Amino acid sequence: MTPIARIAAFASLSIFGVLPVHAQQDPPITIDTHVDIPFSYMHDPKFDAGKDTPLLVDLGKMERGGLNAAFFVVWVPQHKLDAAGYAKAVAQGEQKYDAIGRLLLQYPDRIRLATTPEQLVANHKAGLLSAVIEIENGYSLGHDIHRLDAAFDRGARSIGLAHVGNNDLCTSSLPDTKHGEPAMNSTGDTGMSDFGRAVIKRANQLGMLVDVSHSSDACVREALKLSTAPVYASHSGARAVLDHPRNLPDDLLRAIADKGGVVDAVAYKEFLKHDPGREAAEKKLQNAIAKQRGEKEYDSDKDDYLPAMDAGMAEIQKKYPLATLDDYMDHIQHMVKIAGIDHVGIASDFDGGGGITGWANASETRNVTAALRKRGFSEADIAKLWGGNLLRVWREVGRDAEH
């Protein structure tokens, strides 16, 4: 039995604990729907999430910050659409599943797998954190629909169709135009493939959330037409607030809401605030670090946590301040205005580029709640944003399942 399979069985057990000290002022439950993990997660001692780590999300930071649950991401980068590329993607995905399994097996007294909304809520009531497994980039299925069933059996409950660069499911909001991929919304943007359509159909049957973050506008529109259940965007912003292709336009915010879904606003600096000076300075720093390490290009999985990177980013911050919680609130308020309070949620993209002034890591999660209150959101609204909406959508997706 695999680590994830053992954990899936273990997750149904109940342990009764004490609610956090801050329970009275915290929302009923807080869920961050996008947290990345490095490939060496739970293998390299410095990425042992049960200890104090350089990661933006570890168990201690979640506990101190009042973050009750996180969608931990099985992400793989985009390679070629050939047998070698698919094999590499499948192998890289296995690394992530194994890492999450190690986390859950090593710290069952602190965090449990949640494969249903009910398990997530039960974990919280028992004083435990929850891990939900989320696939980012359906390319890791290796162009084999049966791997979606295998992922479900291992605990995955969300399938992100695309990432950066077009894959075999659909076109991306950030295609690889340098290597000839057509720009989003151009005549060459083909949207969904037959394999992508099959993945959505099977995800509906299994009761998996269909995640359209990173997908092209055309892909999102077709996903909305094809899916028999609500769809969601695990980590996206509002294009009307910042014109970035990774952000969703108002018509798609409305369409996802009309389908009964939810869009989780992402706290990723470049999707919140345009700062060409900072972006150029960061790129220069990355190139310098790659050169120092003898690498052809910067490897965020290895290099993001180097002392030299920390020092360099501190200098950049002095000249080019990060996006702030106020910038983040601007996106949330616009998304609520367009989609409605029942169709917006919260995501950090921590350890995948996320992190802003005021919400720099999971230990600062309560700052988000305070900022929402400052913007005039009621306690009932905050409860919806922090997890109520996501749990509703997840339940609806499960009810529509045929497995």
What is the predicted function of each stretch?
Residues 22-185, 243-403:
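N-terminal hydrophobic targeting/anchoring segments and the immediately downstream early-domain regions
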Residues 14-16, 116, 218:
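Serine/proline-rich low-complexity intrinsically disordered segments, especially terminal tails, linkers
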Residues 142, 153-232, 237-246:
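Divalent metal-binding pocket/active-site signature
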Residues 8-20:
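Bacterial N-terminal signal peptides
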